[in-house]
């Protein structure tokens, strides 16, 4: 009797930092930290205001208005909790394109403008913490 083996797809690897693009926001390439310790993804935004079911914000000096898909209470690494507006937008990472829910917050004091959390990468990628920029510039080792 032959047993049917369940095969899992081989997922592409990500480095712990990657270049991503958000076409809807016309961002060009941005460096994102791939953060398996964070459930949600986050994007640096300024002058954030929610008006009805829309959210207005500035990113890299450009004004944007997108559909608000919700708000999420986030406890940051420094222990503070805040409610952040959330958008859904396309993320381009190398040859991969996918929709992701992203919270908006002031990340001006952070090293990179964007975090990609577990919800965005789950089932799509595996993270290789010894590498960076696997899908973009020449790959680097840690």
How should each PLM-predicted stretch be described?
Residues 1-142:
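Pepsin/retropepsin-fold aspartyl endopeptidases
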């Amino acid at each position: 009797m032959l047993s049917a083996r369940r095969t899992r797809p081989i997922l592409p690897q990500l480095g712990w930092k990657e270049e991503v693009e958000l076409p809807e926001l016309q961002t060009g390439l941005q460096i994102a930290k791939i953060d398996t310790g964070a459930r949600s993804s986050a994007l640096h935004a300024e002058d954030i205001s929610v008006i009805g079911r829309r959210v207005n914000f500035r990113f890299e000096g450009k004004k944007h208005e997108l559909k608000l898909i919700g708000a999420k209470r986030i406890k940051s690494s420094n222990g503070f909790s805040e409610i952040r507006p959330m958008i859904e937008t396309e993320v381009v990472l190398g040859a991969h394109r996918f929709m992701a829910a992203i919270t908006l917050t002031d990340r001006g004091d952070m090293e990179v403008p964007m975090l990609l959390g577990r919800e965005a990468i789950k089932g799509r990628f595996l993270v290789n913490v010894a590498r960076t920029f696997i899908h973009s510039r020449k790959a680097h080792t840690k």
